[in-house]
């Protein structure tokens, strides 16, 4: 805990995957009574125009590994939840402004979440078969969004691209994860400066 500019902040390293990230949201909401949740980190680029180091701001998030279609839900939709989790629009707008001011290549759109590290075109094609507009894939965002929605907290998920999920993702991930983390942290600091 501490202050960043005029904001009280609590930094948490959630760990990898949907369960760990959702648990972090519960702790932040219950123990620290935070007003909002901002999640940053890395992701694998799916959109061909994205390069390592580019940033994706999730306007919405979806699970790419949930299948309750046998019960009448859309593919990716968790029971009694929306298919897509919508980020706070004012947060999206503020991140868009910060990224433009910093001249960082970025996109705003859909991020897909699942408990698998996506490496290989066949896996990307399967995800894009359900969600053609997906920009990036990662392992926490939609769970954070669902948990934030459950505790009625505004949220945003922002990812720096650490790899291009199609080929040798595991190799590029190891090389560029530090760079992606630094990029995400710098953007977050600028975002907090812009908040009223």
Identify the residue ranges that each predicted region occupies.
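Metabolite-binding pocket within alpha/beta catalytic cores that recognizes anionic/polar moieties
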Residues: 1-93, 98-101
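Active-site rim beta-loop-alpha module in soluble metabolic enzymes
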Residues: 71-136, 147, 151
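Short glycine-enriched loops at secondary-structure junctions
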Residues: 61-63, 114, 161-163
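Active-site-proximal beta-strand elements of phosphoester/diester hydrolases
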Residues: 10-14, 112, 158
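Conserved catalytic block of serine-dependent lipid acyl chemistry
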Residues: 41, 139-151, 183-185, 189-192
